[in-house]
Amino acid sequence: MAELYPSLTQCAIVATAFKILLFPAYKSTDFEVHRNWLAITHSLPVQEWYYEKTSEWTLDYPPFFAVFEWALSQLAQYVDPAMLDVQNLNYDSWQTVYFQRATVILSELVLFYALNRFIRSDPQPTKHLAHAASLSILLSPGLFIIDHIHFQYNGFLYGILVLSIVWARKQSKLLYSGIAFAVLLCLKHIYLYLAPAYFIYLLRAYCLDPKSVFRPRFGNAFKLGLSIITVFGLAFGPFVYWGQLLQLKDRLFPFSRGLCHAYWAPNVWAMYSFTDRILIPFAPKLGLPVNQDALTSVTRGLVGDTSFAILPEISKEYTFVLTLLSLILPLIKLWLRPDYYTFVGALTLCGYASFLFGWHVHEKAILLIIIPFSLIALKDRRYFSAFRPIAVAGHVSLFPLLFTAAEFPLKTVYTLLWLILFLFVFDRIAPVPERPRIFLVDRFSLLYITVSIPLILYTSLVHQLIFGLESSITPSQPLEQRIPSPVTSASHSSLRFWYRMSAKASMTP
C-alpha cells in the first residue's frame, strides 16, 4: 500500500491533531450521559448498574458497553476521581472533558485497524478504490460531528462493524465475522437492524453449502451457534442468573418514547409529521377532524408519544411491519446469491429500512446506511449515483446536533469540503458499469445537491439572522423546513439502490 497517497496513517495523524484542538468545543448532554455511566460502572456493583437512576441519563446500552465504560473508569480514577461520583451530576472539569474526548480518539483505533484490513482485503486492481472509500470513512463528517463535538463512541463501534464485514469477505473468516457482529450487538443494540442480513448470509454461506441448501454443514453450524451463544451468555448470563432480564429489556427497549426523536431524523415519519402540520390550516375547509391536544405537541425525545392533529396515529407495530416488508426482496436476493457484494448491499438496505420506517429513529442512525454503503459505493457508477444523494442528505441532516454559533463554521466548512473532495474523487474513479445508467435520475441527484447548498445556508445562518438565535434551535421551525428535501433524497437513494440490488445482473466483481 506504499503507493497509495495520502496513506491512511498520514490522514489519521492529521485528523487526530485537528480533533484534539476541538476538546474545548460544544458538547451535548451525551457527554454527561457517558460521564454518568463511568460513575455508575465504577462506583456500584454490577447488579445495580441497570437499576441506578440518580440521573435521568440511566444506563441503557447492552452489558459489553457497560464493561467498556468500566474499563475506562479504571483510568479515569487517576485523572479526576470526582467524575466517578454518581451524585456529581453535570460534572465537567477540564480534566474530565479532556479525558473523555481522548478516549473517543483512542477507541477509534479500532476503526483505523478495520479500514486497514479492508484495504488489504481488496484485490490489487481495485485497491485504490478501497483506499478512497476508507479515507472517506476515516474523515467522515458524521463521525466528526457526532463523536468529536457532540460526543459519542461511534467510531469504535463502526470499526467493529467494518471488521466484521471485512471478515465476511473470505469463507475462512466467516466464523470470525459472526462472532464480531455478536460482540457488536452486545455493545450497542441499534445494530439489531442489520441482523437479518447477517442471519441470511451466515446461514447460506457458512452453515449451508452455497451451491445447495439441501447440504447442511453441521460442523460449521455447531461452531457458529456455540460461538454466538457463548458471546451472549457472557454478556447477559449474569443478569439472567440475577433475575434482571426484564429490567434490561425495559432499559434497552424503551418503547414508551415517541415515534419521532427530538431532532427528527429525515425519514418517512418526519415527513408524515410535516404533512400533518401542513394540513392543520386546511382542516376546517376540508372538513377534517382535528385533535386539539396535538396542536401543541412536538416531541422532545423524552418519554411520551408523538401526537398527530389530522393524520392517524402510528403504532410501533406498524413501523415494525413496514420495516420488515421493505427487507423482504433484498433478503430473498441474498438467499439466492450469498456473495460478499450482495451481503453488503443487503446490510445497507437494512440500514435504509430501519432509518426510513423505524420507531423513534435518531438522526445519528444515518451512519447505519452511509458506513456500509461507503464500502461498495465505488463498485461502479450506478452504486455511486445512489450513494451521492444519501451522502449529502445524511450529513446535512446532522447539522441540528450542533446549534451553537461557534460550531457553525466548523460543521459547515468541514462537511462541504468533505462532500466536494470525496464526491469529486469518487465521480472520477468509479468504474463505468456494463449496463447504461439512467441519466434522468442522475440529474435529479445533481439538482438535489445544488438545492442543498442554499438550504444549508438558510437554515443554519440566515434563519438565525432574521428570526434570532433562539428560533434556530426550535425543532418545529427550521428543522421542519429541511425535512422534505432530505427525506426525498433518502427515499430516492434507497429506491435506486433497492432497484440495483433487485436487478438480475450479477453483483459479483
From Swiss-Prot:
Main EC class the enzyme belongs to: transferase
Location(s), subcellular: Endoplasmic reticulum membrane
Taxonomic superkingdom: Eukaryota
Catalytic activity: an alpha-D-Glc-(1->3)-alpha-D-Man-(1->2)-alpha-D-Man-(1->2)-alpha-D-Man-(1->3)-[alpha-D-Man-(1->2)-alpha-D-Man-(1->3)-[alpha-D-Man-(1->2)-alpha-D-Man-(1->6)]-alpha-D-Man-(1->6)]-beta-D-Man-(1->4)-beta-D-GlcNAc-(1->4)-alpha-D-GlcNAc-diphospho-di-trans,poly-cis-dolichol + a di-trans,poly-cis-dolichyl beta-D-glucosyl phosphate = an alpha-D-Glc-(1->3)-alpha-D-Glc-(1->3)-alpha-D-Man-(1->2)-alpha-D-Man-(1->2)-alpha-D-Man-(1->3)-[alpha-D-Man-(1->2)-alpha-D-Man-(1->3)-[alpha-D-Man-(1->2)-alpha-D-Man-(1->6)]-alpha-D-Man-(1->6)]-beta-D-Man-(1->4)-beta-D-GlcNAc-(1->4)-alpha-D-GlcNAc-diphospho-di-trans,poly-cis-dolichol + a di-trans,poly-cis-dolichyl phosphate + H(+)
Keyword Amino-acid biosynthesis found: no
GO cellular-component term (any): endoplasmic reticulum membrane
Positions on the Cytoplasmic side per record topology: 25-96, 164-178, 247-315, 377-382, 427-448
Pathway where this protein functions: Protein modification; protein glycosylation
EC numbers, comma separated: 2.4.1.265
Primary location group: endoplasmic reticulum
Membrane topology: Multi-pass membrane protein
A biological process from GO: protein N-linked glycosylation
Keyword vocabulary terms for this entry: Endoplasmic reticulum, Glycosyltransferase, Membrane, Transferase, Transmembrane, Transmembrane helix
Transmembrane segments: 4-24, 97-119, 143-163, 179-199, 226-246, 316-336, 356-376, 383-403, 406-426, 449-469
Annotated family: Belongs to the ALG6/ALG8 glucosyltransferase family.
Function, as annotated: Dolichyl pyrophosphate Glc1Man9GlcNAc2 alpha-1,3-glucosyltransferase that operates in the biosynthetic pathway of dolichol-linked oligosaccharides, the glycan precursors employed in protein asparagine (N)-glycosylation. The assembly of dolichol-linked oligosaccharides begins on the cytosolic side of the endoplasmic reticulum membrane and finishes in its lumen. The sequential addition of sugars to dolichol pyrophosphate produces dolichol-linked oligosaccharides containing fourteen sugars, including two GlcNAcs, nine mannoses and three glucoses.
Protein name (record): Dolichyl pyrophosphate Glc1Man9GlcNAc2 alpha-1,3-glucosyltransferase
The species this protein was found in: Emericella nidulans (strain FGSC A4 / ATCC 38163 / CBS 112.46 / NRRL 194 / M139)
Organism taxonomic ancestry: Eukaryota, Fungi, Dikarya, Ascomycota, Pezizomycotina
